[in-house]
Amino acid sequence: MKFKNILVILNPENEKQYALARAVRLVNEQNSDAPVKITTFMTVYDLSYEMSTLLSPEERHLMHQGVITQRQKMIQPYFEKYKSPNIEFNSIVVWSNNEAEAAVSEIAKVNYDIVVKYTQQESISSLIFTPMDWQLLRKCPIPIMLIRDGDWRHQRRILIAVNVADNDDNHILINKKLVSLGLDLADILERGNIHLVTAYPPAPINMAIDLPEFNSTDCSNSIRNQYLLNMKELRQKFGIDEAHTHVKEGFPEDVIPEVAKEIEAEIVVLGTIGRTGLSAALLGNTAEQVINKLNCSLLAIKPNCS
């Protein structure tokens, strides 16, 4: 898979526009046969324009258009900076007080391949995921890349969080899509390399109290061995080296960020579902805890993404 149509959500407060820079690098590295379309998206809104009773609807509309035109002119220098025969630039600026809803509406109208958005880094160890980020993660029907800067690291390690707890058809399908997308990204980045991670649950300690004959060590080893077998089956399907698979005891919200930090991952790939957060190994609040602990970029994909 190569990206042919990319939507970049701009941040007016980010002067360097890291999301646009990352999208441009992505296009330049994938060596497409035809120009790739990069569309920038931005919302503008000023409540004072809505509250004025002195303006007619037509006058208010003209003022909106004036602000929109001004913002579009501000974007042009970036297009000049990244001008390339490989890229066809387009800009969309809409008047809206709900950036996420406006973005999802735009995505629904056009056949975009991926959304790229910058997410502010709060400190060395964590990122700030804004309310808009969370809305997009829940509602965006296509893969979304939330990045922390404008360039790719030298190692370009891609960590994919998978669920190998069982042979559930949904888990198998999601794992396949996650790994396939990760491999596509690694192929585009040339030096990109794939790692897989899964977390298996600790043995239930309380069971030893009710059942004296229960051996928690044997139980833990049994769970681990099953996860190792399932992970082996998954990695062999895609030709991934055993040294690049990580099967660790613990909870996903702890294991995934720990492994990402340990291998210095460039990006973590997760499966998402709309109403309950992230799935595969991840459900509900667990997903939010994983994301809040990440110190790298994130690529999220829904199971129904083609």
Predicted features along the sequence, with ranges:
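Small/aliphatic-rich secondary-structure junction motif
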Residues: 1-59, 157-213, 237
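Structural beta-alpha unit
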Residues: 1-2, 80-115, 236-268, 276, ...
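General small-molecule cofactor/ligand-binding pocket signal
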Residues: 39-41, 90-94, 145, 195-197, ...
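Short secondary-structure boundary segments
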Residues: 42, 119, 198, 271-273, ...
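A short acidic, glycine-rich active-site loop
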Residues: 59-73, 215-226
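Short beta-strand elements of ligand-binding domains
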Residues: 116-119, 143-149, 299-302
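Glycine-rich, Arg-bearing micro-motifs that act as flexible, cationic patches
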Residues: 117-135, 267-292
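Short, structured interface segments
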Residues: 131-152
